Design a protein with these regions (language model features):
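A glycine-rich beta-to-alpha transition motif near the start of alpha/beta enzyme domains, typified by
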Residues: 1-115, 155-272
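Internal active-site segments that recognize and position negatively charged phosphoryl groups
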Residues: 136-163
Length: 272
């Protein structure tokens, strides 16, 4: 099996291609390949497959074998791989149009140098943002925000991001009974004020640890800032490892024209 190892702001993936048809892969095989001691090592595995109606299809799995959700960083990596492997782009602006578990996406390579690229990815509309009442504690807002940006996210604003125990606090809210049975990804955001970059740390379910970045979490954090009253044309957000930009439109309670821009890198390719 040929595979490609990618990272997007430290969020790393194993990518495989199967343009001839749907690839069968069991959850235990995903777990084995993503294991950092006995496998290749990754936060998730992505399959680039052929599509009857679009340029290609994307399937994503967390490193615990769970699937059926979208991954923003993985979506940007798969767009870069489509470009490197010569898959034609059908969009008039040079973008690839592809199907994913949550619907149809467009992705375009903005720039590329060697193994590194900057990729912009369109995401689906966000139709519901739910305010969640939180216990009043030092350093934490009394209101958090829950939404689905391709997968389920909770955004909590804090003013102590550097000292925060993300593993402990992330697990606490990921398994909170209000979000059972599936749980949520948990993003902790430090907000400095208008025009300042938002800082984000994410506890990712499926990985069950703090990831260096999470694309759908970055989007959720920007939307939560908008809900908090910070209205911008474009948001700059810094994860533990890199910087992203997010833009969207808002009308009648719906966030549309959602776009995520950030870095990708082809680390290596090999045969297993």
């Amino acid at each position: 099996m040929d595979f490609y190892k990618y990272q997007a702001a430290g969020n790393d993936f194993v990518l495989v291609t199967s343009m001839e048809g749907r690839a069968d892969i069991a959850a235990d095989e995903v777990i084995r390949l993503c294991d950092r001691r006995y496998g290749i090592g990754a936060d998730g595995l992505i399959i680039l497959e052929g599509s009857r109606d679009y340029d290609f299809a994307m399937r994503f799995f967390n490193n615990d074998g769970s699937g059926g959700m979208m991954c923003g960083n993985g979506g940007r990596c798969i767009v870069d791989l489509a470009g490197r492997t010569g898959i034609p782009a059908s969009g008039k602006d040079g973008s690839w149009i592809f199907e994913a578990p949550d619907g149809i996406h467009r992705g375009r390579i903005v720039s590329s140098q060697g193994r590194r690229s900057t990729v912009i990815l369109s995401m689906n509309d966000i139709t519901s943002v739910e305010p969640i009442e939180m216990p009043e504690t030092d350093g934490q807002d009394s209101k958090a925000w829950r939404m689905n940006t391709g997968t389920d996210h909770l955004v909590i604003f804090r003013d102590d991001l550097d000292s925060l125990d993300v593993l402990k606090e992330g697990r606490r809210w990921r398994y909170d009974s209000r979000f059972a049975p599936k749980g949520v990804n948990v993003n902790f955001v430090q907000y400095s004020g208008q025009e300042e970059a938002l800082r984000v740390r994410t506890y990712e379910k499926g990985v069950e640890y703090e990831t260096l970045s999470c694309g759908t979490g970055i989007i959720a954090s920007a939307v939560a800032a908008w809900m908090k009253g910070d209205r911008r044309e474009k948001y700059t957000l810094r994860s533990t490892s890199d910087t992203f930009s997010v833009s969207f439109s808002h009308r009648s309670g719906i966030f549309s024209n959602v776009e995520l821009t950030g870095p990708t890198e082809l680390v290596f390719q090999a045969t297993l």
